[in-house]
Amino acid sequence: MKTEIHPNYHSITVVMTDGTEYQTRSTWGKEGDKLNLDIDPRSHPAWTGGTQQVLDRGGRVSRFQKKFSGFLKKD
């Protein structure tokens, strides 16, 4: 196996949206870094049945809603 071509694989701490933490190994960040999640399987509408609102990051959701607001309306 070639040396020095693979990314550094190390332990990090992942912090879920509810504050729980778990250890995993990743190529993200540096050894011991904390990855704070904005959305995770416990809070994402796709896994929770869609009862929670989707975060509008950068106005993407509002742009989509504006663009397709009248798409399924009957005259």
Swiss-Prot record:
Gene3D superfamilies per UniProt: Ribosomal protein L31
Record keywords, A-Z: Ribonucleoprotein, Ribosomal protein, RNA-binding, rRNA-binding
InterPro entries reported in the protein's UniProt record: Ribosomal_bL28/bL31-like_sf, Ribosomal_bL31, Ribosomal_bL31_A, Ribosomal_bL31_sf
GO cellular component, one term: ribosome
Superkingdom assignment: Bacteria
GO molecular function: rRNA binding; structural constituent of ribosome
BP terms from Gene Ontology: translation
Function text: Binds the 23S rRNA.
Assembly and oligomerization: Part of the 50S ribosomal subunit.
NCBIfam families xref list: L31, PRK00528.1
Protein family membership: Belongs to the bacterial ribosomal protein bL31 family. Type A subfamily.
Entry protein name: Large ribosomal subunit protein bL31
Annotated organism of origin: Rhodopseudomonas palustris (strain BisB5)
Phylogenetic classification of the source organism: Bacteria, Pseudomonadati, Pseudomonadota, Alphaproteobacteria, Hyphomicrobiales
